[in-house]
Design a protein with these regions (language model features):
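Generic beta-sheet signal
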Residues: 4, 142-148
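Loop-to-helix element that buttresses phosphate recognition and phosphoryl-transfer chemistry
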Residues: 8-66, 116-129
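Active-site metal-binding loops of divalent metal-dependent hydrolases
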Residues: 10, 150, 197
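Phosphate-coordination/substrate-recognition cap region in phosphate-metabolizing enzymes
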Residues: 38-104
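Glycine-rich phosphate-binding loop signature in dinucleotide/nucleotide-binding domains
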Residues: 44-47, 135-142
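Short glycine/proline- and acidic residue-enriched helix-loop micro-motifs
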Residues: 103-123
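Acidic, His/Gly-rich catalytic cores of divalent-metal-dependent hydrolytic chemistry
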Residues: 192-204
Length: 204
């Protein structure tokens, strides 16, 4: 059995302010650093064979906290990057609704296919699943931790559950540094945990 642990990165100021980040390279804030340490303490109690991370700073900082606790060297993986939100980077929900009212309404309904000037959701899905499959193949029968982003986690969960990208609104975003666990059991993928934040008591 192969276990892939998907950890969302710790909090940034833009997370706290409700702003879209996408490929914007924002660092962790003080709360995010504390969340990363809590995740690292939990991972120190797990048997983990490999550590992967998105190459964006908020993920690599989170992975660095895990490295200090486990001794595993993070492997930067561009395929784990957050979705490119294009022209929405830095905007909060209210600003996006004012600038792109039609798009925003359809986004809330799950009927848009991309962000304005950004990545197609189908491309995000293919990228996320490609990274997931490579990690799972490389660590067959082992456990690997991948520090990534909400968009990546949701794309993988939708695939595991057999849902189309338009079902995104049905998958709640997890708190920063929450854990989602997927197991590959023979040829079947099983969602074992979604947005587990038990290690973040008092930090979310």
């Amino acid at each position: 059995m192969t276990r892939i642990l998907l950890a969302r990165h710790g909090e940034t100021d833009w997370n706290r302010e409700g702003r879209w980040q996408g490929h914007s390279d924002r660092p962790l804030n003080a709360a995010g650093l504390a969340q990363a340490e809590a995740l690292a303490r939990r991972m120190a109690g797990e048997r983990i064979d490999a550590l992967y991370t998105s190459d964006l700073a908020r993920a690599s900082q989170t992975a660095e906290a895990v490295r200090r606790r486990t001794g595993l060297e993070p492997i930067p993986t561009p395929g784990l990057r957050e979705v490119d939100v294009g022209e929405l980077a830095g905007l909060d929900r209210a600003e996006a609704a004012r600038r792109y009212p039609d798009w925003y309404t359809r986004w809330r309904e799950g009927t848009v296919e991309s962000y304005p000037g950004g990545e197609q959701f189908s491309d995000l899905r293919d990228r996320a699943l490609g990274a997931f499959d490579r990690i799972a193949d490389r660590h067959a029968g082992q456990t690997a931790l991948a520090v990534c982003h909400n968009g990546i986690v949701r794309a993988i969960v939708l695939h595991v559950l057999g849902l189309e990208p338009g079902a995104r609104p049905r998958i709640a975003p997890g708190p920063n540094c929450s854990l989602t666990v997927v197991e590959r059991q023979r040829r079947r993928l099983v969602l074992v945990a979604l947005n587990d934040a038990g290690h973040l008591d008092g930090l979310v």
